[in-house]
């Protein structure tokens, strides 16, 4: 990976698989790196991809400028992720199966990446721009995880419902959950309202680990090789 990416590897626990983390709109922040460390602590090789080459937005205008710059070349984003994926798969300590997860801007990119050529074995979305066209969504080749906020307006509950309908129509299994009475960003920023955010954030994390276990289980690799 590029030197600005952040790699966390398991030390005292078995290697369960690999997760690529895709940042929010403000860049590869300390919180995203902490999340990569949390994945490593439970047994995953975790690469937090830096799509801004070391830059971090400090306010809304800077964040928007960085997003617009990268979204002018969406194909380059996918190429960068594929390059990171290839580098990871070449490592001797990385199992063959890889999932992506992203937040907001990163959630949208994770979903787009899942529409590619099947390199990805799992996709976990925390909010983000969604799709609802079954003809597009049927390109996804695995179950999709999603965590959303009931008080969010982007995506709204109605948009999440349309996404779920699109997945079901396309025949894509999904583990989608809308948490009532929390705002956009509740999972990464639990401390903003601990009383309200902590319980749903912990529940979403448990669901995510169960999802990754289903998608990246070594038993799946063994069965393919049998």
Regions found by a protein language model. Give the residues of each.
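C-terminal catalytic histidine-bearing segment of alpha/beta-hydrolase fold enzymes
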Residues: 168-226
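Acidic catalytic loop of the alpha/beta-hydrolase fold
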Residues: 151-155
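Short alpha-helix in the alpha/beta-hydrolase fold that links the catalytic acid
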Residues: 35, 156-167
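A conserved short beta-strand
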Residues: 119-129
